[in-house]
Amino acid sequence: MTERLRIALIAHDQKKDDMVAFAKAHEQALARFDIVATGTTGSLILDACPSLSIQRVKSGPLGGDQQIGAMIAEGTVEVLIFFIDPLSPLPHDVDVKALTRLGSVYDIPMALNRATAEKLIKALD
């Protein structure tokens, strides 16, 4: 039996609706993965897609980004989809930079916007 790929879903506040729409559009494909998400993003996705099983960690500003970064470093998260809002100032910007840095260091597939996420989910499906 092969292990399922583990994918992380994260979205900044102004991008959460877009992440929910992405999850709804790809609910069947996402159901084939183990999913981890930051707290609020995970809750919103679960409300819209109750068939998905999502492990929720803390909210991003409360350490959730760092928790997922640790999972990337440990090799337990293999794909990152993170809808970043480049136009809003973020008090936890250093956490965001650290998370995307780890995605690059560990060379995992990483989508930081909807257009790239659409291509990535199709490639993984």
Curated annotation (Swiss-Prot):
Enzyme class label: lyase
MF terms in GO: methylglyoxal synthase activity
Protein name (Swiss-Prot/TrEMBL): Methylglyoxal synthase
Pfam families, per the entry: MGS (PF02142)
Recorded family membership: Belongs to the methylglyoxal synthase family.
Entry's Gene Ontology BP terms: methylglyoxal biosynthetic process
Keywords: Lyase
Catalytic activity: dihydroxyacetone phosphate = methylglyoxal + phosphate
InterPro entries: Methylgl_synth (IPR004363), Methylglyoxal_synth_AS (IPR018148), MGS-like_dom (IPR011607), MGS-like_dom_sf (IPR036914)
GO CC term (a single one): cytosol
SMART domains: MGS (SM00851)
Lyase is among the record's keywords: yes
Residues that coordinate or bind substrate: 12, 16, 38-41, 59-60, 92
Active site per database record: 65
Record's keyword annotation contains tRNA processing: no
Function per UniProt: Catalyzes the formation of methylglyoxal from dihydroxyacetone phosphate.
Domain MGS-like: start-end pairs: 1-125
The EC number(s) this enzyme carries: 4.2.3.3
